[in-house]
Amino acid sequence: ISAWWILVANAWMQNPVGMEFNPDTARNEMVDFWAVATSPMAVNKFFHSVLSGWVLAAVFVVGVSCWYLWKNREKKFALASIKIAAWVGLCAAVLSAWTGDGSGYQVAQKQPMKLAAMEGYYQGQEGAGLVAFGILNPDKKTADDGKDAFLFRMEIPKFLSLLAERDSKAFVPGINDLLKGGYPLKDGTTALSAQEKIEKGKTAIGAFSAYRAAKAAGNDAEAQVAAKVLKENVAYFGYGYIKDVNELVPNVPLTFYMFRVMVMLGGYFILFFIVVLFLVYKKDLSQMRWMHWVAMLTIP
């Protein structure tokens, strides 16, 4: 339960649903509890995080049990613990990968700039490929500097479109598209540019100030007009504090490489548990000291 509410709060900060901005209190106030508590982003984050915790616990149990085998102590207990932990770990690792796919889809829908940074993806296209492995160009500093994003990359064709839109032919916007806007959205509207969002944010900030001033002066008519303008632009409120559109782009190298480290570790854990299960059932794991070291070193 504690993990659920922590991750609900985290998901809300990344995709605020079930709330409205109250200009009288200058706060976002909840209007739909269940929209907050059961948002798709929160659900995905909960299962992905909890399952990842189970993977960690399983790795720890296998590693400690292999330490007992390495010391030639409590052999029966250690082997029984390894069998249970490896099965739990394998199931959790596979399910974690599945929920990770769901998290990727939610990021694509609600935080497309984060997805673009995760992929080092600057120019949108239909049937976009997913970078399986790549080396970013360290000379590329901004989205519009004209330099290639990669020195080298290996790509899985159309997989990014499949991840982001569940359609291998779908258009996925890149960093440049998200900054410049102009591409069609699924609701039939056209995406705003970052500069347009900044202007709307400034309009919202101005309307909020006008509303507070009108209320303080007792001018309800002006307050209603300002409240209407604020409501129309409040979704872009935060953009009004942005000075340069490049501030909206995350640290691409950090995001790109850390995402791949996470994916590689996920693949490693699945392979690790498969090997452990094979050895504990088909071989004499208690005599395989090299595997004891692998298991112990996997803990950190």
What is each PLM-predicted segment?
Residues 1-300:
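Polytopic transmembrane helical bundles with strong interfacial aromatic enrichment
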